[in-house]
Amino acid sequence: LYELPLREHASNYEQLLALLQRRRSIREFHEKSVPADMIEKILAAARTAPMGLPPSDVNVMILDSREKNRAFANDFCTYLEGMKWFVSGWFLTMMRPIWGKSNHELFKGFVRPLFDIYIGSMKKGENHVNYDAPLSMYFYGSPYTDPADPVVAATYAMAAGESMGLGTCMLGAIHPLIQNGKRAKKFRERHGIKYTSREGLFVIFGFPSVKYNKGIKRTFASETRN
């Protein structure tokens, strides 16, 4: 247990809203490393995230250099190369009656192009997996985790990074591609990823090399008041 901070030390609504409104997805970073004390502050904030069933079953993989992130991305693209049959035309055609129209459209319109972008860009020396970020964190669960827990913890980490002037971006496409099959298991083992997990998110951090002056006004699909 610890003593709760005084209320006057907490941000007010306007400050919190300003932090959230200023956030833009940043994928271009200076080469400067994220200091160890800032990494610990991000983790300290993420540890405060609420969970469905205490104690937390959230796990975090930390890649704390551009070189580590490039190595992970290279291995991920090599792994995807061996799975290209998974998004081949013949396989998608065969699976359409089994998994339905919506899943077919998802794989045809998003997953297959994603494979091409990841693999093709890496062959050109461009990392579109984690963008050679100075820092990335992968939040994932265990077989017993509330599916929302890793996502909430990742969100807290992102906000903490933003509060210290770091650029951040959530990356959701890596996680589902390393969950199933023998090749995925070997990939996870190589990188010390302990469990499969229903939900998981990567967050990348770094000192931004781009500056935005405008934000995007976001809305929900619907808001129903009963």
Predicted features by range, described:
Residues 1-226:
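Acidic, surface-exposed loops and disordered segments
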